[in-house]
Amino acid sequence: MIDLYTWHTPNGRKVSIMLEEIGMAYNVFPINIAKDEQFQPHFLEVSPNNRIPAIVDKENNNYSLFESGAILMYLAEKSGKLINKSNSDEYYRTIEWLMWQMGGVGPMFGQVHHFVKYNKGKSAYAEERYSKEARRLYAVMDKRLGQHQYISGKEYSIADISIWPWTARFDWQEIDLSEYKNVTRWYTEMADRPAVQKGWLVPQNDQLIPSP
């Protein structure tokens, strides 16, 4: 059993989607970041960086882990699913694109959300800088998905799970997904997965998955 500390953000949804995909039982502990609940002492014990998501593996001596990418890798290895260790190319492509998301998509899209959605008009320079970088990243993704069905290649993996929740906020980024036909194809296929639909709703929200 996994204890999941999360909120309905892209990083939080990665882990709930992953848990649904691998069929692993989990308890949900909502951490409302709008109310600064991530700074409560009990959560600090699980996540020293005061950020969601975080997990505690009750079956592994209450082993705790934070950082969404690390959690995805842990759950993939624990379950033996969504990361192909028998195919070295597929395995390292998965890690490669997971790191691409962690180092590029997450930080850059997050800055777009901050300057374009929440602080629009306060810094034309920041809006242009981060929006331009977001479009570049979408173009990189579009090219990759024009060559392969999934981000890693032939197989659905944690790389797809890590990236998809960030693209699901294309409206926050003022991105027209129709400009990226391969991303749109992949995004729609992902949105149709039952596990993605279930994981999207964690914790307790009724937000619809945005349609491109």
Task: Outline where the language-model segments fall.
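A generic structural-conservation signal
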Residues: 28, 84, 154, 179, ...
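Short, solvent-exposed turn/loop segments enriched in Gly/Ser/Thr/Pro and often Arg
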Residues: 32, 158, 203-206
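Short secondary-structure boundary/hinge segments and terminal tails
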Residues: 36-37, 93, 188, 207-209
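Phosphate-coordinating loops and pocket residues in cytosolic domains that bind phosphorylated ligands
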Residues: 45, 163, 192, 201-202
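GST-like domain detector, emphasizing the conserved glutathione-binding G-site
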Residues: 1-128, 142
